[in-house]
Amino acid sequence: MDNKSVLLDGYGRRINYLRISVTDRCNLRCMYCMPQEGIPKRAHHDIMTLEELQEVAVALVELGIDKIRITGGEPLVRKGIVGLVRELSKCEGLNEITLTTNGLLLSEYARELKAAGLKRVNISLDTLNPQKFEYITRGGSLEKVLEGIKEAQSVGLTPIKLNTVLIGGFNDDEIEDFVALTVDNEIDVRFIELMPYRTGSRLWSLEKFISSDSVLKKVPSLEKIKSEDISSPAEYYRIPGALGKVGLINPITCKFCENCNRLRLTSDGKLKLCLHSDSEIDLAGPLRRGEDIRGIVLDEIKNKPREHSLEDGEYIKRDMFKIGG
């Protein structure tokens, strides 16, 4: 099949971006994301092998996917992750492989990942205060994350994007500090609205919600800039003369569904057409039976929803750490 194919959904949107969750396991226990006790260990046959994930990815690239992001859980806890990146990088028609991580293991893997073909990384980081970091992650080391950021910069996994979930009463006093990181560094900081999910429901309240207006009020020197990618969920701003950018991702107050270009593949082989929908398509079963999963995707892609319904209180049942954001 021609790897220059174009994959379109029922609304004429070009779908060219696949996010692969390689594991639902994580080495942190962030309060809004994962239970303190962790999650039950799953049987091996319930999780796709890296070879199976690669096979699905190759099939989707043949249909028109040209960008892949590897996520988790925490993807760097999955054994063989560097090998997966290396194999995917050989895939003709794939232009970019990126990875989202909490950064704890990044100092160990950054150089190998870069050599394997990874282009850049997004790092989840909600505070620059070591004590607050240990609290929100239930025991994590901010120092290790900062080491990972430095190593990623050193080997060229840039521009680095920091994903910061805004939580009222926790890190809203650090907005200016995060923005300051963009001035002299090739780092983009993206502030993300706290979204209501099962694990994070107790954190979800009006008092803890922070909209993008609050960020702009705290840093009035931010100037809006034109986005280079209309499918990006972020609206970007910059302090004049800064090397990096500031992004605002507002799934609650400002939908970005109109230009959605992405699919999500979970570690147990389910294809999600929309992050905020419980609808899933099983690809693991058909793949293991030797069926052509490309035909399944082509049949199902027309059912990708026009938009989410978060504002109506419709929240998905699957935990975010099982999807990869």
UniProtKB/Swiss-Prot annotation:
GO terms for biological process: Mo-molybdopterin cofactor biosynthetic process. It catalyses: GTP + AH2 + S-adenosyl-L-methionine = (8S)-3',8-cyclo-7,8-dihydroguanosine 5'-triphosphate + 5'-deoxyadenosine + L-methionine + A + H(+). One of its GO terms (molecular function) is S-adenosyl-L-methionine binding. It holds the Pfam family Radical_SAM. The keyword Lyase applies. The keyword Nuclease does not apply. Belongs to the radical SAM superfamily. MoaA family. This is GTP 3',8-cyclase. The gene is moaA.
